[in-house]
C-alpha cells in the first residue's frame, strides 16, 4: 500500500475556495481504481493548513492517478490557492496478525 500526504498552507483569502474544491476532488479521486482512501484534514492550530491523505493499493494505481486529469486539477488548485505545498510518500506493508502482537 502507498500512502501520500500532501500538506498545504492555503492563502487566507482562498481558504473557503480550497475547501470547496478539495471536497469535490477528494470524492472523485476516491472513485479511482486502487484508491483506498482520500481524505483531508484541517490543522487544529492553523486554520489555513490542510493535509490531504491518499492511500493507494500499489504503485501502479498511484502512477495511473498521477497521470490523470483529476490529479492535474488537484495540482492546479493547490498551486493557485496555496503556498509551498509539501508532498510525502511512504510505502507500507500490512503486517500479519501474529506480527502485530510482538
Residue ranges of model-derived segments:
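Non-catalytic surface loops within mature trypsin-like serine protease
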Residues: 10-12, 58, 91-94
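Glycine-rich beta-strand-turn "strand-cap" elements at beta-sheet edges
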Residues: 2, 40-48, 76-102
